[in-house]
């Protein structure tokens, strides 16, 4: 494909998505990366998945290419990654209903659950800790649970971004819905960079072969 081909497809997609007319599938693999969160609370711990998507878009040079799509109820951007194409998605529904946006976009782009990455916060890991989970249960995360329900599968690979768990169980809701502290905010740029590196490296490796290995 000529240089800029994927970016041109992204610009055409912004005009065509309102009619659900999609660009032809590129010759390489196509993957979706969905950042889970609450659209009205972008700076909170619970929406750190959306922050990772923002950094991913900047890294791939499509930070100004987000398009709001009413069919998916999400912001979408297309980005090239070698011969592959990434569909970046930020749901515009509340966390508990994120799966509806993810499943609709997967349907429109012809993606299986295994081709959909979820990026989300993880209470049981300290801030700065990252882990890639290849499918499995939701582990109590409502956004992941919604995706499993709407996709009828638990096979989605997930990038879990640690936000730490408060000492008192009754403080969990306030913790996840709260903003990062000033000290935590100093760690965020490096964390977002590392998360972006991890997911891009994993997608590159999978694009070169059929396995789902880490």
From Swiss-Prot:
Any single GO CC term annotated in Swiss-Prot or TrEMBL for this entry: mitochondrion
Domain of life, per lineage: Eukaryota
Enzyme Commission (EC) number: 3.1.1.29
The family database entries (SUPFAM superfamilies) matched by this protein are listed as: Peptidyl-tRNA hydrolase-like
Organism, scientific name: Homo sapiens (Human)
User: Record-annotated residues binding tRNA?
Assistant: 96, 142
The annotated active site, in chain numbering, is 46
Q: Which UniProt keywords apply?
A: Hydrolase, RNA-binding, tRNA-binding
Q: Which InterPro entries match?
A: Pept_tRNA_hydro, Pept_tRNA_hydro_CS, Pept_tRNA_hydro_sf
To which protein family does this belong? Belongs to the PTH family.
Pfam families the UniProt entry points to: Pept_tRNA_hydro
Q: Which gene encodes it?
A: PTRH1
Q: What is the effect of changing residue 121 to A?
A: Abolished peptidyl-tRNA activity
Q: Which reaction does it catalyse?
A: an N-acyl-L-alpha-aminoacyl-tRNA + H2O = an N-acyl-L-amino acid + a tRNA + H(+)
CDD domains (UniProt xref): PTH
Q: Which NCBIfam families match?
A: pth (TIGR00447)
Q: What's the protein here called?
A: Peptidyl-tRNA hydrolase
- Point out the annotated site residues (description: Stabilizes the basic form of H active site to accept a proton): 121
Q: Name one GO molecular function term.
A: RNA binding
So what does this one do? Peptidyl-tRNA hydrolase that cleaves nascent chains-tRNAs that are not stably fixed in the P-site of 60S ribosome-nascent chain complexes. Acts downstream of the ribosome-associated quality control (RQC) pathway to release non-ubiquitinated nascent chains from 60S and 80S ribosome-nascent chain complexes. Does not act on ubiquitinated nascent chains, which are cleaved by ANKZF1 for degradation.
Entry's Gene Ontology BP terms = rescue of stalled ribosome
């Amino acid at each position: 494909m000529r240089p800029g081909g994927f970016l041109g497809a992204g610009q055409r997609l912004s005009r065509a998505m309102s009619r659900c007319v999609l660009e032809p599938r590129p010759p390489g693999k196509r993957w979706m990366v969905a950042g889970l969160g609450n659209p009205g609370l972008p700076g909170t711990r619970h929406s750190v998945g959306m922050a990772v998507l923002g950094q991913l878009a900047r890294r791939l040079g499509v930070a100004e290419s987000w398009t709001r799509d009413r069919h998916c109820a999400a912001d979408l951007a297309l980005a090239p990654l070698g011969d592959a194409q990434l569909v970046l998605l930020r749901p515009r529904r509340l966390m508990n209903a994120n799966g509806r946006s993810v499943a609709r976009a997967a349907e429109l782009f012809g993606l299986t659950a295994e081709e959909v990455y979820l990026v989300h916060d993880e209470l049981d890991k300290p801030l700065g800790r990252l882990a890639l989970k290849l499918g499995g249960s939701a582990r109590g995360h409502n956004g992941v649970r919604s995706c499993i329900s709407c996709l009828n599968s638990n096979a989605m690979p997930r990038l879990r971004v640690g936000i730490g768990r408060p000492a008192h169980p009754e403080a969990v809701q306030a913790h996840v819905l709260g903003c990062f502290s000033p000290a935590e905010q100093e760690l965020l740029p490096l964390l977002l960079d590392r998360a972006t590196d991890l997911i891009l490296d994993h997608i590159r490796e999978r694009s070169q072969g059929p396995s789902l290995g880490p």
